[in-house]
Each structure stands twice: as structure tokens, then as C-alpha cells.
Amino acid sequence: MSPGGKFDFDDGGCYVGGWEAGRAHGYGVCTGPGAQGEYSGCWAHGFESLGVFTGPGGHSYQGHWQQGKREGLGVERKSRWTYRGEWLGGLKGRSGVWESVSGLRYAGLWKDGFQDGYGTETYSDGGTYQGQWQAGKRHGYGVRQSVPYHQAALLRSPRRTSLDSGHSDPPTPPPPLPLPGDEGGSPASGSRGGFVLAGPGDADGASSRKRTPAAGGFFRRSLLLSGLRAGGRRSSLGSKRGSLRSEVSSEVGSTGPPGSEASGPPAAAPPALIEGSATEVYAGEWRADRRSGFGVSQRSNGLRYEGEWLGNRRHGYGRTTRPDGSREEGKYKRNRLVHGGRVRSLLPLALRRGKVKEKVDRAVEGARRAVSAARQRQEIAAARAADALLKAVAASSVAEKAVEAARMAKLIAQDLQPMLEAPGRRPRQDSEGSDTEPLDEDSPGVYENGLTPSEGSPELPSSPASSRQPWRPPACRSPLPPGGDQGPFSSPKAWPEEWGGAGAQAEELAGYEAEDEAGMQGPGPRDGSPLLGGCSDSSGSLREEEGEDEEPLPPLRAPAGTEPEPIAMLVLRGSSSRGPDAGCLTEELGEPAATERPAQPGAANPLVVGAVALLDLSLAFLFSQLLT
């Protein structure tokens, strides 16, 4: 199990959980300032790995993380929609399924958080679009299939002719119930999702009749022209045939070819109601979420248009076929047929009609090619949608694991919280992330990025503890309690050779130093120095963990005028196979480190001590010879 603790951010955030090598590692919980936002789950070397993030507004993410960003499989939930699938660089990417509470759903490819590539979108009323996408909008070739007219969503604005794509589309209210005896509904009461063709009595036709009281065109709005033409209804080629007439006017006024003259004012046709079971499908080009380019739209009752489109309207050259089999063709402008505009040349009418016919044929041929391309893209989009559904299922499974990891992290945080309530100064960091106060309590050096760590944390002054060691607070304590019988140099192996060896010689040296202790006593070493077995990081020595008592060593001093030599010790902590005596080892370093303490001026010189010990041994040897 990884060691654990608590880390307080300067902005008020907090992390409680495990860490390793100065970074968040294992299970942990990280909260933002004022407990706004929380991540709980697994951590890996300072970054989120698998867990649950809950935002201030209640939205959540459950899944994989990498380098502080959402990466892999995951589920994001907000108040009005849910996304399940793959993530790339913190954004929705590759493949996934997006669903809204209104019933709108997209399944397919994603890029940079938007629908991009191939996918299938199902609208709130049940209609579908299958085809290409770009930057979250329908763009390229695709097929839009509507539901029966009485089930189609009622658009809020009469000017709208299509449902918008993507999660930006708000929920559409259900369509009103039809009146008794009316299976469908009048198009004038509002547009329906997926229905864009305007036939006799449709919305565009009704509005055009209101704007054009007479069927002869906008020239008849003038009272002066009406008076001049009161004697005869037939107009000249330069006036009558050059007028702008609406689509409904041409359809109602005559059953002949476009541009034919009417023998009298046309009779007002009753509004044609769309059957409740009628459906409509469009296959062709899309640009910026609208029908634009070449395409074909066909209704189940036989109404059909082939040609050019712009902004969900017939615009350009095309051909319209009515349910009764009659046709009209020519140039359309904003969903209305234009009969060549005002004639400003003396070209024969037959020659002019021939040029229009040629352009119409080219437009119809382009529309049919667009239908073929759209059908191919439709099949690809269906396959990508099936793959996205599989990714969504896998993401849901990962989300369940993330929830379990979050539960474990919260349990561990609750267990660690009482242990961390002991008083003590906590480390604070300046703007550059360096410690400005002494470390009295171990802290996980995690990376701060908003609510969660994102970059490297400041390392502790000493080498990190081994993964096999249990956690210990970094407060440096002396391992030499009163009354102890062992010290860091209690083993004979730890004595330097120039100090006289081991055994009885060491006892004689200790007795000799004890006699002069009062006069040779110098300033003792500082807390945390290697001589006292102190430590500068969170892990203690093996002796400290076992609670063994150690005997303090007498201080050493050097005679006046001699240069003190620094003594460097590296304390290696951790379990050892050579027994408790090997708990603290010493190693001479080439250069003095930050934790090295040079000998004090009042300490004894090791050379002098060695010389005195050698003299004492010589005297003892001579005395023994005299006795023998």
C-alpha cells in the first residue's frame, strides 16, 4: 500500500490520499477551492488515472485520464445530455454516442469535441440523418429521412425548414394534436421537421399569394398598369413574360408549360393539406448544416424536386414533378420559379427556352449523381454508428470501474483524515513552487492544475523512500533516547580503522574519553544530521521503526588551530537481510552535501585521539612484559 497524507493548495484546494516519491500515487481525493469540484479515484505519479470528476454545476466525468486530461474511454454527464465513448486530449474524439434528454442522439465519429467524419443522427421526432459531418455540422453528402407528417416535430419558427444538428439543438415541443376530421395539418400553421418541399397550398405558396394579389405578377400591383390593361388581359412579350411569378401562381393558373399565359384571373385553389402518413426524404449535398448544392427531395405522395439547393430552399436550375404527373422546370430563386426575368433582348422565345432546358438537364443530372454519392456515404455512416455504439458500451463498463475506484479513494481518505489532524506546520509554496517553510509534516508533492495536479511536483531534499517502507512523518527526531544501550556505531563494523579497532581497545578508548569529558565537551550535532541518524524526508530508519534504544556517542573536538575535516554520512533506510545492525550504514562521500556537518572547532582531532590510544597500548604492553 502506498503511503498517504494531506496536501493543502494555496488557493484553498486540498488533496488527501496516497503518494509516492513526492507525487500523488494510489487512491486519493482532490478538491478545488471552497470544495468546488472534486476528483476521487486512482492516481499515477502525480496525475489522474481512473476515477470520477464532479464539477461545481453537478456535471460529472467517469473514466480514464492521462497526463491530467481525459484520455481513453469515459462517460460525461450533464443536466441535459450524456456522452459515452472515446476521449482524446481532454475532448470528445474518435468514436462515441451523444444523447439528449429530448431524444436527440448522435452516434459516429468525433474530432476536437465535435461531430466530424461519418455518423448517424436521430432527432427527437424519430427522423434521421446519415452521412458526412464537419465541425459539428452536416457537411458533405448525406440522406435526411423524415417521419410521418403527423409525427414530425413542429418547428418553433415558421421560417425554419429543418431541425438543426448537434447538441446545440434545444428540445422541440411535441406537435399539437390534429383537429377532428383532419389527419394531417395545414403547413401554414408551422413547418415540420424534415419537410422542405413546397407544393400547391404549402406554406410558401400561401404566403406568396398574400404578397401577390393578382396572378399576373408584381407589375399588376400598380393601379396605373391595371387601368391600362383593363381592356385586355393579354400582355406583350416584354411585359408579361418578363414578370416574376410565384411557384403556386404558375401551378394554379395553367397546366401548360412554364411561362404560358392565362386567359383570365386564376381561381383560388383550396389549400392542399399534407396527408398525415406522408414522409419526405432528401439525398444530396449539405453545407453548413443546410441543404446546399445538388440533391433530390421526394415526398411519398409523388411530389419530387431534382436540381440545385441553397439554404434548404430550391435555388438555381431544377425540375419539380407534381403528384398528378405534371412538371415545371426552370430557374428557382429562394424556392420560387423565375420565368427568365424581364426579357431585355430580342432573342426568339424558342432559343431562350432551349438554353434554360439545357441548364435544367445539367442540374438534374448533377442531382442524380449527388444522390448516388449520398447513398454510399449513408452506408459508411451506418457502419461508423454501429462501431460507436460498441464504444459506448465499453465506456459504460469503464465508468463503473471508475465509480468503484472513487469509492475506495474516499474510504482511504476518511481513514487518513484522523491521522492528519495532529498539530504541525504545513509546507506552503511560493509562486515558483519552492518550499518557503521547514517541513514538519510529510506532504504529497502533487501538481496543481485547477483542481487536480498536472505537472511535476517539487522533490523532497533527500532521496525518496523505498516502496517497501511504511509511511513516516518527515519530522526529524533523534534516534538516541535517554537510557539507550545502542547507537548508530554500536556495531564494530561501523568503527573507522584509525579510531583503534574494536573490542577491548574500544572500551579503553571510551573510558579514556569519559575521564576528559568535562573539559573536552563541545557543541553537539544539530537535529536531523546524519550523525544522529536524522532524516530529511518522510521515511525513518529501521531502528526508528523498531523503537530500539541507542547509546549517544561522546562528542569529538579538534585542537585549536587545526582545520576541521567534514564528515559526510549517507543514511540508507529500509529493511536489510543482515539484521538490525545493518539498519544504518555509513558511506563517505566525495563532496560535502547539504546535510553534511563539518567538525566543530571544539571537537577532538581523530589523529590526536589515535596517537593517545596507541601510546596507552604501548605502555600496557611494556607493563605486561615487566610482570612476566
UniProtKB/Swiss-Prot annotation:
GO terms for biological process: calcium ion transport into cytosol; learning; neuromuscular process controlling balance; regulation of cardiac muscle contraction by calcium ion signaling; regulation of cytokine production; regulation of release of sequestered calcium ion into cytosol by sarcoplasmic reticulum; regulation of store-operated calcium entry; regulation of synaptic plasticity. Coiled coil: none annotated. The keyword Repeat applies. Residues 231-241, 253-272, 453-467, 528-541 have a biased composition (Low complexity). It is a peripheral membrane protein; Single-pass type IV membrane protein. Residues 1-606 are cytoplasmic. Keywords: Cell membrane, Endoplasmic reticulum, Membrane, Repeat, Transmembrane, Transmembrane helix. Residues 432-443 have a biased composition (Acidic residues). The chain crosses the membrane at residues 607-628. One of its GO terms (cellular component) is dendritic shaft. Pfam families: MORN. It comes from the Eukaryota. Residues 158-214, 231-276, 415-602 are annotated as: Disordered. It is found in: Cell membrane; Endoplasmic reticulum membrane. MORN repeats lie at residues 50-72, 74-95, 96-117, 118-140, 141-163, 164-186, 317-339, 340-362. Its main location: membrane. Residues 170-179 have a biased composition (Pro residues). The MORN (membrane occupation and recognition nexus) repeats contribute to the plasma membrane binding, possibly by interacting with phospholipids. Belongs to the junctophilin family. Junctophilins contribute to the formation of junctional membrane complexes (JMCs) which link the plasma membrane with the endoplasmic or sarcoplasmic reticulum in excitable cells. Provides a structural foundation for functional cross-talk between the cell surface and intracellular calcium release channels. JPH4 is brain-specific and appears to have an active role in certain neurons involved in motor coordination and memory. This is Junctophilin-4.
